[in-house]
Amino acid sequence: MLLIPAIDLKDGQCVRLKQGDMDQATIFSEDPAAMARKWVDLGARRLHLVDLNGAFAGKPKNLDAIEAILDEVGDEIPVQLGGGIRSLETIEKYLDAGLSYVIIGTAAVKDPGFLRDACTAFQGNIIVGLDAKDGKVATDGWSKLTGHEVIDLAQKFEDYGVESIVYTDIGRDGMLQGINIDATVKLAQAVGIPVIASGGLSNLEDIDKLCEVEEEGVEGVICGRAIYSGDLDFAAAQRRADELNGELDDA
């Protein structure tokens, strides 16, 4: 089970939002590269970056911070990034800069042809981000709820060749209410590619529950507010996941 620390970038700083609201941002660090180093030193095997300004603007907005993070840890672990990725040129620029994966969210829902082209051009580097509330997909930094069913879109995007899916339950993100395990497993069972859970991770109990369903195709979880607020000790959580995985592998 991959525990993936999130570094959400707003105006060059590492922040956390409450339910996607840019006006409810808590600043956790003014040095995102140092934050990246901290998580890697604590045992992170992948990092999840979000360009929040980019997500709302529709184009990259935190390039300096992203490049600083890649300079710091990009040679050591894979780094994935979402937010504001709306063109093949942007994807190419990011991959050339050292990102391992780019996450396409809103653009995938609004312009499936773009996602298909991206998967063809950059095979193995494209992750799709599906944000949903009550099974329906949301777009535009969560501000618009669509009529699309998550599972229908996920299956379509799997056919395009996406590497994996980051699934966020937006009713829970930043609220420390626990991961929506049932919805995540249901999605993972419906597709043959890995699903990364996101939104609401709060404690070791969530880690236990996620490890139990790893065989269903849930390969990782994004760690956000809980590791910044201190509600979850990241290093302890990663150790716990490794121990549980070892036990499951031995079973």
Curated annotation (Swiss-Prot):
The UniProt entry annotates the active site at D8 (proton acceptor), D131 (proton donor)
Q: What is its EC number?
A: 5.3.1.16
| Keyword terms, alphabetized | Amino-acid biosynthesis, Cytoplasm, Histidine biosynthesis, Isomerase
* InterPro entries in the cross-refs: Aldolase_TIM, His_biosynth, HisA_bact_arch, Isoase_HisA-like, Isoase_HisA-like_bact, RibuloseP-bd_barrel
Its annotated compartments are: Cytoplasm
Q: Which GO terms describe its molecular function?
A: 1-(5-phosphoribosyl)-5-[(5-phosphoribosylamino)methylideneamino]imidazole-4-carboxamide isomerase activity
Metabolic or biological pathway, per its Swiss-Prot or TrEMBL entry: Amino-acid biosynthesis; L-histidine biosynthesis; L-histidine from 5-phospho-alpha-D-ribose 1-diphosphate: step 4/9
Question: What's the catalysed reaction?
Answer: 1-(5-phospho-beta-D-ribosyl)-5-[(5-phospho-beta-D-ribosylamino)methylideneamino]imidazole-4-carboxamide = 5-[(5-phospho-1-deoxy-D-ribulos-1-ylimino)methylamino]-1-(5-phospho-beta-D-ribosyl)imidazole-4-carboxamide
State any GO BP term from the record: L-histidine biosynthetic process
Q: Which SUPFAM superfamilies match?
A: Ribulose-phoshate binding barrel
Cellular component GO terms, alphabetically?
cytoplasm
Which family does the UniProt entry place this protein in? Answer: Belongs to the HisA/HisF family.
Q: Which NCBIfam families does the entry link to?
A: 1-(5-phosphoribosyl)-5-[(5-phosphoribosylamino)methylideneamino]imidazole-4-carboxamide isomerase, PRK13585.1
Name this protein carries in UniProt: 1-(5-phosphoribosyl)-5-[(5-phosphoribosylamino)methylideneamino] imidazole-4-carboxamide isomerase
Per the UniProt entry, what species is this protein from, by scientific name? Burkholderia multivorans (strain ATCC 17616 / 249)
Lineage from the top down?
A: Bacteria, Pseudomonadati, Pseudomonadota, Betaproteobacteria, Burkholderiales
